[in-house]
Amino acid sequence: MRILGIETSCDETGVAIYDDEKGLLAHQLYSQVKLHADYGGVVPELASRDHVKKTIPLIKAALNDAGLTKDDIDGIAYTAGPGLVGALLVGSTIGRSIAYAWDVPAIPVHHMEGHLLAPMLEDEPPAFPFVALLVSGGHTMMVEVKGIGEYQILGESVDDAAGEAFDKTAKLMGLDYPGGPLLSKLAESGTKGRFKFPRPMTDRPGLDFSFSGLKTFAANTIRGNEDDLQTRADIAFAFQEAVVDTLAIKCRRALKQTGMKRLVMAGGVSANKYLRQELEVMMKKIGGEVYYPRTEFCTDNGAMIAYAGMQRLKNGETTDLAVQAKPRWPIDQLAPIK
């Protein structure tokens, strides 16, 4: 079975073709970073219009890369949510239309389920069950995963997501958009210990997160110190250290609570080198294992959507011709694979 996956939930247009026997056959990705850079953030209307321009050409390019035609495709998977409603409608409408024209089934895919299953694209995928840390610009949550569709949310952010806090703090420091990766790069030249940031919500039981206070703390620290490069690097280090420590503490609690020794990390922030390093050290200490996708599959992409859709189409799931777009869609509402 070969599935064409389409991802248009925010500011990346992703298309991929996944074969259940041969694996990933083609992967195309277009980022809108330059389009939104002048605005300092994603402009929904511009994002939607650009998806309209890019999705069909990327589908053609993916088919060409795989050496396939439309007759070789057995199903369509498209991101239906959560995300920006206009952007979701572009991918959903194109996916549904192609499925109708090509006479193949189509399946709406949950964006965060795609991220959660992205490590399954690797040569050594994690086995079920495991604890998943989904950490991106729009979401930060801890999920107990017993199987595909068997998700229990253990904790989530009550305000800003971790990636959002990175980007907002980077903006306070005068870094370009998108600021998160630039802040992490700046932190590499920072001095450990000069500044001490709090570890929010780690002094109480539970697995929820809160990162908006760190942004405020960073703003006050920036205002109260010299505006030189080393000081900014030291602040960046302290901020990143606080976020990573907070995530690690919550992961350790979740693993202890569930009795598991496998941790999966996915989403855009999972590409952060310092976060990977710290979680690897933590898991080694407790005799566990940590899994994450290759860097190119940490951000939004069509490959994870094609893979997730493949699992559900093989399970016999499909939907009617109505276009589905769900800006809000809790992951624990998904049906389990039988």
UniProtKB/Swiss-Prot annotation:
InterPro entries linked to this entry: ATPase_NBD (IPR043129), Gcp-like_dom (IPR000905), KAE1/TsaD (IPR017861), Peptidase_M22_CS (IPR017860), TsaD (IPR022450)
EC numbers listed for it are 2.3.1.234
Q: Does the keyword tRNA processing apply?
A: yes
| GO BP term, pick one | tRNA threonylcarbamoyladenosine modification
Q: Which cysteines are joined by disulfide bonds?
A: none
Q: Which residues form a coiled coil?
A: none
Query: Which locations, inside or outside the cell, does it occupy?
Result: Cytoplasm
Sorted alphabetically, which NCBIfam families does this protein's record hold?
gcp_kae1 (TIGR00329), T6A_TsaD_YgjD (TIGR03723)
Species the sequence originates in:
Aliivibrio fischeri (strain MJ11)
Q: What is this protein called?
A: tRNA N6-adenosine threonylcarbamoyltransferase
